[in-house]
């Protein structure tokens, strides 16, 4: 904000709450004062926030509103209450028999997956193929930083857990990359890119025979 016509400015809202700056969700789209008052309303990718004291503090007006936009969703094969969902601009959310939709990783929630055998082993991601892993049922996630050789994927980079074998996961860039040790290391399933310089949009591993992988790139389907 500025209190002298724009000559000087002070940050009064920050996504990460830098220092003593109060939290306001990122990606702002609109701001407006309530007529005849000092109440300022700000519209963001995380909903509506309000200040009544010139930005010294903000109120989140979105509590209790069960709304968001999910990019991707996955479910445990053994426990249907275990669900992961990646929400645009609002992180990745986990639901289970003991957790009622908790945000487990932040940023832009993208693709995700739960291990075929071990429900404590789960994965989330953010944009361009930045993946995270939890080994304790979503209590803590750490970055999987072993995929740097694959380059940059799509904004929503596709990801799948193997439908049969534990610790086995796949990620789609220009090639399909596979890990058999829960993301500890990766290898490409092919020597060449599937379709030139085009990234993979989506792919699925057949549960009847995991050697069969169907890949979608632009308007084409590859197997």
Please annotate each region the language model reported.
Residues 1-223:
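Beta-propeller blade termini and top-face loops
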């Amino acid at each position: 904000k500025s209190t002298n016509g724009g000559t000087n400015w002070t940050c009064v809202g920050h996504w990460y709450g830098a220092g003593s700056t109060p939290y306001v969700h990122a990606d702002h789209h609109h701001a407006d004062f309530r007529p005849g008052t000092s109440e300022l309303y700000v519209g963001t990718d995380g909903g509506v926030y309000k200040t009544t004291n010139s930005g010294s503090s903000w109120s989140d007006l979105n509590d209790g509103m069960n709304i968001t936009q999910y990019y991707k969703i996955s479910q445990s094969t053994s426990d249907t209450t275990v669900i992961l969902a990646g929400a645009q601009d609002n992180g990745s959310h986990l639901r289970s028999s003991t957790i009622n939709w908790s945000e487990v990783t932040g940023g832009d929630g993208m693709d995700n997956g739960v291990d075929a055998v071990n429900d404590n082993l789960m994965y989330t991601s953010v944009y361009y193929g930045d993946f995270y892993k939890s080994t304790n049922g979503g209590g803590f996630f750490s970055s999987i930083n072993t995929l740097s050789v694959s380059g940059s994927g799509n904004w929503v980079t596709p990801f799948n857990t193997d439908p049969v074998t534990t610790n086995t996961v796949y990620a789609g860039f220009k090639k399909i990359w596979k890990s058999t040790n829960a993301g500890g290391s990766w290898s490409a399933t092919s020597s060449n890119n599937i379709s030139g310089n085009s990234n993979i949009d989506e792919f699925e591993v057949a549960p009847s025979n995991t050697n069969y992988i169907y890949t979608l790139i632009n308007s084409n389907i590859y197997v």
